[in-house]
Amino acid sequence: MKNPFIELCGCICLTLLTLAPQPAAAKTAGEVPPADTLRTVFFTDIHVTPGNAQDSLFRIAVAEANASDADLVIFGGDLTNMGSDRELAHVHGLMSQLRKPWFTVPGNHETTWSESGCTTFRRLFGHAGCVATRAKGYLFLGYASGPYMKMADGMIRGEDLAWLERQAAAARPGERIVSLCHYPLNGDLTNRQEVTETLKSVGVTASLYGHYHQLQLRNFDGIAGIPGRALAGKRGEAPGYTLLDFFADSVRIREKPLGMPPVTRYTVCLKDDPQILALPC
């Protein structure tokens, strides 16, 4: 299939902003050193159905990720359109072609319309929605946000919040904890305040999210909302994904159109960033 957006490569000149990591603070014995640079690919809302446009686009994205210098690939949910067993098996097969470590949480398209009650997701991905991953001084805690029935709002289950607290309590000294949830931690969740209070109590200062398909920073009650864009893009936008570069105390958010160089969109301090705190909750 011809990809017109690749033809734009010769017409677009992009200037990248380079951010140097800050020197690490003095460490106590046994402390995990802060990340020098943790380079991640952040896929969310890829919405793959066998044979659809996103199926082809995601194959290209996987090839790009494999050829990149990324240390880790993160999936923020909505891997499929209907959450069917066939779709889940297909997209899992494509994800398994990645030659980088990766992990995923489910999105509403996996939980709301699941034909297996989410048991197929558990069988394929090894968990029912909660997953912890360590990389270069960072601890990523991912969890499901529902909904768990049609027409319902999103919600973080009480047992998942308890899991978050247990995992955070087991963090190594010096580890920075980052939350991952498909839904933004706002009014789309029925228990938003309980979630953000729990996260803040365990030291989470940034939360990755998808669902809205666009790169827009958000303020989740003082927690930095770090977005991921949808694979297909909105009308007039090139297909693409998000690159997140984690430094000792900040994260750089870059948009990566397929077949084109990445563009820096934001750089965010991982604690008390003024541009985050100035946003409405």
Which ranges hold each PLM region?
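Active-site glycine-centered loops adjacent to acidic/histidine catalytic or metal-binding residues
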Residues: 45, 77-78, 107-108, 182, ...
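Bacterial N-terminal signal peptides
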Residues: 9-20
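Extended active-site neighborhood of metal-dependent phosphoesterases/phosphodiesterases
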Residues: 32, 85-176, 194-206, 218-228, ...
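Active-site-proximal beta-strand elements of phosphoester/diester hydrolases
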Residues: 37-50, 137-147, 178-181, 224-230, ...
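Acidic-and-aromatic substrate-binding clefts and catalytic sites of carbohydrate-active enzymes
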Residues: 49-53, 79-86, 111-115, 185-189, ...
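A short C-terminal boundary segment appended to hydrolase-like catalytic domains
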Residues: 27-29, 33-36, 245-281
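Bacterial N-terminal signal peptides that target proteins for export
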Residues: 1-10
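N-terminal active-site segment of His-dependent metallophosphoesterases
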Residues: 23-89
